[in-house]
From Swiss-Prot:
The lineage of its organism: Bacteria, Pseudomonadati, Pseudomonadota, Gammaproteobacteria, Pasteurellales. GO terms for biological process: D-alanine biosynthetic process. This is Alanine racemase. It holds the Pfam family Ala_racemase_N. The gene is alr. Keywords: Isomerase, Pyridoxal phosphate. It comes from Actinobacillus succinogenes (strain ATCC 55618 / DSM 22257 / CCUG 43843 / 130Z). Substrate binds at R130, M302. The modification N6-(pyridoxal phosphate)lysine is found at K34. Pathway: Amino-acid biosynthesis; D-alanine biosynthesis; D-alanine from L-alanine: step 1/1. One of its GO terms (molecular function) is alanine racemase activity.
Length: 358
């Protein structure tokens, strides 16, 4: 019997990357490993896929330095750029690449003394309206970056789709056209396709792509990843720690929010919000036990959840429970909860054990 455990498959990870290569065979790949590789373990993921990818993308300089400390030598890109001019010498010494998306970053590059030039990617706002320089500012930024001694001569260009998972929207096509026009004749590498772009917008597969959630076998939409040929890298499991007879009309859990309409058996599973399993979920959220789906009933506790096993169940203490994985797609669980698959994976706490397989 084990407590909450995230089982991570290297074979699934490698399979997904091969599938991505097949979809964009002419593009180089930046593997996104921010947020501890979406909860999968950044050291394991990076070392597993280093030979299959051309670089890594992270959100914080600390994440980049962790990769370097683990012996990763491939290029690493700071997707949000640097937060302080004090970071620039560290970036230069550790051969880290950075996005530039605002005037403050540009001025810091001009004014800081560095031991060697840095590879820079200019982020262009094509319609996400979160980060990036305006379309009418691109030429000025490019000119200033090319004059800066701290910047390597070949500038990269990057942008981000806001609706790549909305196949009936024209907005992605509009963003792509803006990006292509803004970078026309610039000569540097370009990257705009993340997971949604890779799956649904082949015209956006430019010199570089940057897979995130699909690398981990999860769909960027409500559609289960299996329909795209992806295999979940993470299977979240736990164990039944109690099976109890329960009378009709009796409540379960804090606040008595769920009352059984008939005699049944209640299973208690060793996972709760202390492990990162969301607290505010509806009754009926599915889990997988012994080949079938059963519903969560009552409130999620810090360490436990309760499920309705049915009166005639044969489940016993110690049986494995799957919270999500190949048998129960995380997309299905997330949709039932009304949240994103990204949230489920990245919110798991250190209390959840990790097992690396294959």
């Amino acid at each position: 019997m084990k407590p909450a455990t995230a089982k991570i498959s290297s074979l699934a990870l490698k399979h997904n990357l091969e599938l991505i290569h097949q979809k964009a065979p002419d593009s180089k790949m930046i593997a996104i490993v921010k947020a501890n590789a979406y909860g999968h373990g950044v050291e394991f993921v990076a070392s597993t896929v280093e030979e299959q990818v051309d670089g890594f993308g992270v959100a914080r300089i600390e994440e980049a330095l962790t990769l370097r400390s683990k012996g990763i030598i491939k290029p690493i890109l700071l997707l949000e750029g640097f937060f302080s001019a004090k970071d620039l010498p560290v970036i230069a010494v550790n051969n880290i690449q950075t996005v530039v998306h605002n005037r403050e970053q540009l001025e810091a590059l001009k004014q800081t003394k560095l031991p060697n030039p840095i590879k820079v990617w200019l982020k262009i706002d094509t319609g996400m309206h979160r980060l990036g320089v305006a379309l009418d500012e691109v030429e000025d930024y490019v000119e200033e970056l090319k004059k800066c001694a701290n910047v390597e001569p070949l500038i990269g260009y990057v942008s981000h789709f806001s609706r790549a998972d909305e196949l009936d929207s024209d907005y992605t096509r509009i963003q792509l056209n803006r990006f292509l026009q803004a970078t026309e004749d610039k000569g540097g590498p370009r990257c705009i396709a993340a997971s949604g772009g890779i799956l649904f917008w082949p015209d956006s597969h430019l010199e570089w792509i940057r897979p995130g959630i699909i690398m981990y076998g999860v769909s960027p939409t409500d559609t289960p990843s299996s329909e795209f040929g992806l295999i979940p890298v993470m299977t979240l499991t736990s164990s039944l720690i109690a099976v109890r007879r329960h009378k009709a009309g009796e409540p379960v859990g804090y606040g008595g929010t769920w009352i059984s309409k008939k005699d049944t058996k209640i299973g208690v599973i060793a996972i709760g919000y202390g492990d990162g399993y969301p607290r505010n979920i509806p009754s009926g959220t599915p889990v997988y036990i012994n080949g079938r789906i059963v519903p969560i009933v009552g409130r999620v506790s810090m360490d436990m959840i309760t499920v309705d096993l049915g009166e005639d169940c044969t489940d016993k203490v110690g049986d494995e429970v799957i919270l999500w994985g190949k048998e129960l797609p995380i997309e299905t669980v997330a949709k039932h909860m009304g949240i994103l698959s990204y949230e489920l994976m990245t919110k798991l706490t250190p209390r959840v054990l990790t097992e690396y397989a294959d």
